From Swiss-Prot:
It is an enzyme of class 5 (isomerase). This is Probable tautomerase LL0574. SUPFAM superfamilies: Tautomerase/MIF. Keywords: Isomerase. Belongs to the 4-oxalocrotonate tautomerase family. The active site is at 2 (proton acceptor). Its EC number is 5.3.2.-.
Length: 61
């Protein structure tokens, strides 16, 4: 039962997330042999200021 956590800067629409979730689900099913009904995709929306790389704040592009 795969769980995939996707962390993105906030601002994606529900429709965009649905497309991303569908493609992730299809890829895992194809390459790992898991049934699509067992694959969970969880989105975490990150507000700006919550992600740092190399000590520097990452900004939305």
């Amino acid at each position: 039962m795969p769980y995939v956590h996707v962390e993105l800067f906030e601002g994606r629409t529900v429709e965009q997330k649905a497309i991303i979730a569908k493609e992730i689900t299809e890829s895992i099913s194809k390459h790992a042999g898991a049934p699509t009904s067992a694959i969970h995709v969880i989105f975490n929306d990150l507000p700006e200021g919550m992600l740092y790389q190399g000590g520097e704040m990452k900004k939305k592009k």
